[in-house]
Design a protein with these regions (language model features):
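A bilobed periplasmic-binding-protein/Venus flytrap-type ligand-binding module shared by bacterial periplasmic
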Residues: 14-19, 76-98, 102, 111, ...
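Immediate post-signal peptide segment of exported/extracytoplasmic ligand-binding proteins
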Residues: 23-27, 93, 140-174
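Structural transition elements
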Residues: 119-158, 179-186
């Protein structure tokens, strides 16, 4: 297909007469832009669209087992990760380790997200079989370890409000997410609930997707969601360099750890 017109709202495609593999099934194809995942699912269900991608885990059950729809699930090269800024309260490595150990990522993937996600052990997803998922996770889910790390670090609940504090300041930080992907707010709320169990007050800050990269580059976050394709070209080097290449002398502001 070739592009006839392209706007923010939709793209119109026409059959390419010179396509190498012969005639294509449709003379024209319209691709509307539907950012909200719930609206996307409703449009598919009502027949307003014939095909949709990235149906949220809460809506996928509407189409599975329904003869009117064909559901295809594939192992994605996409990864969801939380970027932790090493400034402020999260600049403490024991606090960071406690945060990670307090999060039940397997439960999020299997139950909350209905098996549409796989817990990861490394930045590269298991769909790219480099063997990273066989590595031992030093910060595996263990809320008792989280409590111990925080206690060793001097955090106590001195006023009985359920939130730890030190030097008169509560253990609190923001988690920045966007909601155009249905799973991200669900994930953030689950993290928030798990952290509260170990005495951490995590507040969710929802922003427009278009602000995410800017906030990441400027370091304007405590913890920030990223949902990104790891191998746009079949090679993960761009993804790894973008997030983990050193930020010495400000050469890579996406790396909040320096």
């Amino acid at each position: 297909y070739v592009v006839k017109s392209f706007t923010k709202e939709r793209a119109e495609m026409a059959a390419n007469e010179n396509y190498w593999d012969g005639a294509v099934p449709f003379k024209t194809v319209e691709i509307p832009s539907i950012d909200d995942p719930n609206t996307r699912a409703m449009s598919l269900q009502s027949g307003d669209v014939d095909m949709a991608v990235n149906i949220g885990p809460g809506e996928i059950g509407l189409f599975q087992g329904n003869d009117k729809f064909k559901v295809e699930e594939i192992a994605s090269l996409r990864v969801v990760l939380a970027r932790i800024n090493q400034k402020g309260v999260l600049g403490d490595d024991k606090v960071r380790a406690a945060v990670i150990s307090a999060t039940d990522r397997k439960n999020y993937a299997d139950v909350l997200l209905k098996g549409t996600f796989i817990p990861g052990s490394a930045p590269i997803p298991p769909s790219m079989d480099y063997g990273f998922n066989d590595l031992k996770d030093p910060n595996a889910y263990n809320p008792e370890r989280s409590k111990q790390l925080l206690a060793e670090d001097g955090w106590k609940d001195t006023d009985g409000d359920g939130i730890l504090d030190k030097d008169g300041k509560p253990l609190t930080f923001n988690f920045v997410v966007y909601n155009s992907r249905a799973e991200l707010p669900l994930y953030a709320e689950a993290v928030q609930a798990d952290l509260k169990k170990v005495g951490i007050d995590m507040k969710i800050k929802t922003v427009d997707y278009n602000l995410i990269d800017k906030m990441g580059q400027e370091g304007d976050y405590d913890m920030l969601i990223s949902n990104i394709v790891t191998a746009n070209t079949g090679d993960p080097i761009w993804f790894l360099a973008n997030y983990w290449h050193t930020n010495i002398n400000g050469s890579n502001p996406q790396n909040g750890s320096g």
